[in-house]
Amino acid sequence: MEETTIGAVLFDGIEENPYLNELYDAILYNYGRQLFGLTNLPEKEISVPAALRFADILSKSVHTQNEETHKLWAQELVALLNALRPDDELIQYYLGSVLTRVSNFRGVSLKAADYVSADLLDRIFTQVSKEYLRIPEAENEYFFRAQKEIYEKFNEPYFSYSAPTSLGKSYI
């Protein structure tokens, strides 16, 4: 029997989960309906607690190939739900949790500044992550992890990288 981790079992193929995709499609539909003012179209029913649970799970992905995709999807789910229901306290809590878990501290400061995890270990991990990702000479600004990895290689004798615009290359 081949050894595996619980993370590999949990996250392998999650992006193909029919219920997750059904929820995602309904969220996108409702967001498009709201964005374009198509109130004549019926709103699709969404189980917000289920969508938030999926976002929470995806934000904790350790999948070897799809970790970044899962974490981006988690952020998208909570951002869209927040746009649909900006006054929902449960969505606000998950928004802060997901953004913190994926180390999107800029997003936390903009959209979930009041978020504080109920878990002590999460709060400690967040503080350590924030200190690690802090931009030198900028007290309340943080790199994304990929940006930090690039920044740390600037002093190497040979350095080259290629990345999509969404990485924020000009910011580095």
What are these model-derived regions, one by one?
Residues 1-172:
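N-terminal helicase ATP-binding lobe
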